[in-house]
């Protein structure tokens, strides 16, 4: 099927640790089996993209490439075999595979040469995505700054608590890192009946927001010894049974492991920089303690997105107090700088903004 458009604007990672390049890119001439053309309305900016830009996992073999993995979009065209969405549908864009075909990745061009992209990218005004990376939602009057979070931040927070940690109301929760996901962990933990929620961060403004959203106790991280001392003083002998690190900071991970209960589930959401190592004493793992990395909370978009959307629509999950800040695609590097500086909440790229 011939595409209705031939080019679009995108933010491109051309060189690691450098600002993104805003430029027009060329789309392929048609859609292949399982591909869907969407017009992106808004996209969330996730810590994972900061990691990509800074090559946290090691040298980037795919440069130049597109970025972004949580978005809100309109379907424009569908390729052969697509049955779960139709032109005119509104969809959440997500990186976790859902239902439908997993297509080949699209082949864009930038300056006449191939531009790499995965099954979903959201920092481009128009995107060709795999059918199983989008989930249809009702065409209601949605908050365009919140809906993208269903593609990663919200579904990850839910999945980390329910799937990875298998949290229950009698658990006590400790969270390191109160960024976009950390704040939502507080929100969802409250819905799941968790009464004791302790949070640690290096920014006082984030800790203040955490209290506003329902945290029981906040601790300002300055160094490992001080933080350990503050946590020991607060918990005494009743260590938390679920501990989640969203930072990827190796010192934070060590504290999470050391300060947790003997039968605790310690879940790692953040990823340490390539080459950084954590030192732990493994004996507790033989006697009930669990330490594991999370892959997006093992969320299932086709199930979790409708569930979370219903909670939002009924105000069970109240997000009017969840901080977001929107930027045009031309200002995406400003959004990245804000996120890296520790500004509270989620940075949103809004393709309906002209400047």
Q: Locations of the language-model features?
A:
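C-terminal hydrophobic helical "lid"/dimerization subdomain
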Residues: 1-6, 254-258, 302-355
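Short amphipathic alpha-helix with an adjacent loop that forms part of the alpha/beta core around
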Residues: 224-237
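Cysteine-cluster motifs in flexible loop/terminal segments that predominantly coordinate metals
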Residues: 46, 94-133, 144
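Mid-domain Rossmann-like dinucleotide-binding core that forms the NAD(H)/NADP(H) cofactor-binding site
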Residues: 139-223
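Glycine-rich beta-strand-centered segment in the early N-terminal region that forms part
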Residues: 28-43, 56-100, 138-140
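Glycine-rich phosphate-binding loop and adjacent beta-alpha segment
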Residues: 194, 250-316, 351-355
